[in-house]
Design a protein with these regions (language model features):
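N-terminal charged/capping segments associated with class I S-adenosyl-L-methionine
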Residues: 1-51, 64-84, 94-100
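Class I S-adenosyl-L-methionine-dependent methyltransferase module
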Residues: 50-144
Length: 144
């Protein structure tokens, strides 16, 4: 399943529409995605956060039966969230679409996948790197 059976949803909007607690002020929204097979709902929700005008923290929890699908989602979300200084909009779009819909990729895309894959392995297996990322996240959260 590559493309999904439903259009991308703004899950924060869906929560506001159907929640019985819609007038209750919450600081954190936890979203569990099971078998979504791609990150379209995550991307749409993140892209639409400005419309809601709140400072809501959104946690996404993704469960997939196949670890390959999780790795694919993480790679696609990494491309979408890559800083503009690292990857321009046109390059980001080409890379995202190439990985989203193709089996064969260009050499430049294969190099990007290899670099990011090594970074992901480092993130998971190196405790010092995890502590560094956590500290960096805390500092960035405090600055914002």
């Amino acid at each position: 399943m590559w493309w999904g059976y439903s259009p991308a949803l703004d899950l924060q909007d869906e929560w506001e529409r159907y929640s019985s607690k819609k007038y209750e002020i919450i600081k954190e929204l936890n979203i569990l995605l099971i078998g979504a097979a791609d990150g379209r709902h995550v991307v749409k929700t993140l892209a639409q956060t400005y419309r809601h005008g709140n400072n809501l923290k959104i946690n996404f929890y993704v469960y997939e039966a196949s670890l390959d699908l999780v790795a694919r989602q993480v790679m696609l979300l990494t491309i979408a969230l890559e800083p503009p200084e690292e990857l321009g909009l046109q390059d980001k779009t080409r890379l995202f679409l190439e990985l989203y819909g193709n089996t064969l990729v260009r050499p430049a895309t294969a190099n990007f996948i290899a670099r990011k894959s090594a970074q992901f392995v480092h993130m998971v297996t190196d405790l010092d790197f995890q502590v560094y990322l956590w500290c960096e996240f805390i500092v960035c959260s405090l600055v914002v």
